[in-house]
Curated annotation (Swiss-Prot):
Record protein name field: Pre-protein VI
Region span, Involved in endosomal membrane lysis: 36-53
Annotated source species: Canine adenovirus serotype 1 (strain RI261) (CAdV-1)
GO cellular component entries: host cell; host cell cytoplasm; host cell nucleus; viral capsid; viral procapsid
Membrane spanning stretches: none
Taxonomic path: Viruses, Varidnaviria, Bamfordvirae, Preplasmiviricota, Tectiliviricetes
Domain notes: N-terminal amphipathic alpha-helix domain is essential for the membrane lytic activity. Late-budding domains (L domains) are short sequence motifs essential for viral particle release. They can occur individually or in close proximity within structural proteins. They interacts with sorting cellular proteins of the multivesicular body (MVB) pathway. Most of these proteins are class E vacuolar protein sorting factors belonging to ESCRT-I, ESCRT-II or ESCRT-III complexes. Minor capsid protein 6 contains one L domain: a PPXY motif which binds to the WW domains of HECT (homologous to E6-AP C-terminus) E3 ubiquitin ligases, like NEDD4.
Motif (Nuclear localization signal): 233-236
Induction comment: Expressed in the late phase of the viral replicative cycle.
Amino acid sequence: MDAVNFSILAPRYGSHPMMSAWSGIGTSDMNGGAFNWGGIWSGIKNFGSNVKNWGSRAWNSQTGKLLRQKLNDTKVREKLVEGISTGVHGALDIANQEIAKQIERRLERQQPLEPEVEEETVETKSEAKAPLVVEMPLKRPRDEDLVITADEPPSYEETIKTMAPLVPMTRPHPSMARPVIADRPTTLELKPSDQPPPYSPQSSNMPVTAPVRSRGWQGTLANIVGVGLSNVKRRRCF
């Protein structure tokens, strides 16, 4: 049962599921399997060893020896070294020339400094002249002394002596006042009309009326809620 259930998930070789033989999975024996990198690496090593053997044979052969002797006679190595050195020096010279040109351009952009002109100092001799004397009129002084003279008021004793003796009067107004004899006491006589009338409370003529209660549901509502405040409208002219 297990083999039947998991056969769909197993890798297949064609139409046959591979349930037991796991050693062949991922190799070149399967259709669409992994690539054999070991064979490629071994082939590269073999090719490199073959090239090395060929080169060593050619270098140690008689032809190789003659070629090396010819190169030494013609001084090819020295020429190569000289060419490399001249190329390096030429590159350095070109770089130095470019740097010098850039410096000259920047110096030309700057404005030339103007030479400083020394200012000629002319010594002026001061001629002795007589001082001018100007007569100015006398100015009015700003702060003037103001002297105010005032008579002193008389003393209290002097005013008492000069005043007439005080006599009680019968009336408050001076035009109605009369001197009072010393034996009689001073009284203030008032007219009958001057006395204020006795206070008597005014009776209101407004009849007292009780609120009229209507019958039915309105009267019941008035008993529960109350009549409320009476609204009175009055017209006033200002």
